[in-house]
Amino acid sequence: MCIRDRLSTGLAYLIGNPNFDLMTGKYYARFHVKHQDSSDSYLRKAYTNLDLHTDGTYVKEKTDWIIMTKMEEQNVGGGESVILHLDDWEHLEDLSNDPVGQEDFVWGSPKSKNVDYKVEHPVFSKDKNGKPIISYIDQFPEPKNMKQGLFLQKLSDALEQSKNKISFPLPVGSTIFSNNYFWLHGRKAFKEHSGLSRELLRIRGTFFY
């Protein structure tokens, strides 16, 4: 384990308990984004935007926070990090109060995630202070009807078109630590290069209570 692994893992255990990652069989995940990829994961599709989302939408465990560390990269253009806080989102009041967004949606996952079940939960709910929180990713919902499908499309459009998204290059060795209930994160598409390589470390977990 390198120094960046140790620092990220140390931070994780200072703030809570890391979740077991079924995709890797460990309490963290390290993965590469490269020029060519044959997996079923959007995370590894270099030349496609990774739209704004939260983590843990398709698992039974709570996901309070996420740590993302850039381990290394070569021949990279583009691929900037994108984040959005719910309080800065122009359409929060409208969509978080839509009754459809408070219905249970079915959430599944591709084979690479190694999760052999599906879960149900709403997109929007409230925290203990009555503030809206979100659990959403555009790749995994299985709408039960047209009403839910149209809501998901409206939600996706409203997030991606937000003028308050923050886009920035994350230097190698840097870490993003975010609350998973009101920070959404994503990534811009990379510029094509045959030697493209980026390695990331991800840890997800729950706060101490």
Regions found by a protein language model. Give the residues of each.
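Short, small-residue-biased leader/transition segments that mark boundaries at the very start
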Residues: M1-I3
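Mid-sequence acidic-hydrophobic segments that form the walls
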Residues: L14-P18, M71-Q74
